[in-house]
Amino acid sequence: RECVEVRGIEKMGRGAVDSNLVFIDGLVVPDADRIGAEGEGFRMLLDTLNPERILIAAEAIGIGRRALDKAVNYANERKVFGRLIGQNQSIQHPLAESWMALEAANLMVWRAAKLYDEDQPCGAEANAAKFLAADAAYEACDRAVRTHGGFGYAKEYHVERYLREIMIPRIAPVSRELIMCYIAEKVLGLPRSY
């Protein structure tokens, strides 16, 4: 344990899950305890990222759906000038678009999960699922806040929390930009850009 130091990270969200910096210095790993060949650990780690991307995508869908449900419920209850705000197309259309985007992204999540479960290559699908789900969910969360107007900024309605929580699927375990690089190179056959 003297070779390992753990430091907590304060975050804007994800209070239920610890995040830490782990420093390992001077730790000797006997050959018998090593997994795989020396220097191949990072390559082995990359193979574990597909299920993580699928999981993060499914999480994003759940957060987006919850935010959308909150927005729809609020739009069906809130009256302004004697009229439900949900009667206005400027409220309806963004929420309808979010529902469609979330459902489309969810199909890619299920496609990626099916391929993974069948032990098939799923890098493109896992990356696409994560990209599409994170974007669709972010839009749904942003629209939920805006549907609530000033109350969207208040903790009482919880939509501000969903907007904070959806940031992780947008940036982890891989950024949107790196996903686009992966798709461009591995799926479309374009030259490597980095």
Model-derived features: positions:
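FAD-binding core of flavoproteins
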Residues: 1-73, 83, 175-179, 185-194
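N-terminal alpha-helical segment
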Residues: 38-41, 108, 162
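Short alpha-helical scaffolding segments that buttress acidic/His motifs in well-ordered protein cores
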Residues: 45, 71, 112, 163-167
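Alpha-helical transition-metal enzyme core signature, strongest for iron centers
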Residues: 61, 65-68, 95-105, 109, ...
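C-terminal helix-coil-helix/basic helical segment that borders enzyme active sites and/or dimer interfaces
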Residues: 72-86, 99-132, 145-153
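Short alpha-helical transmembrane interface motifs in multi-pass membrane proteins
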Residues: 92-93, 126
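Alpha-helix capping/hinge segments and adjacent helical runs
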Residues: 120, 127-194
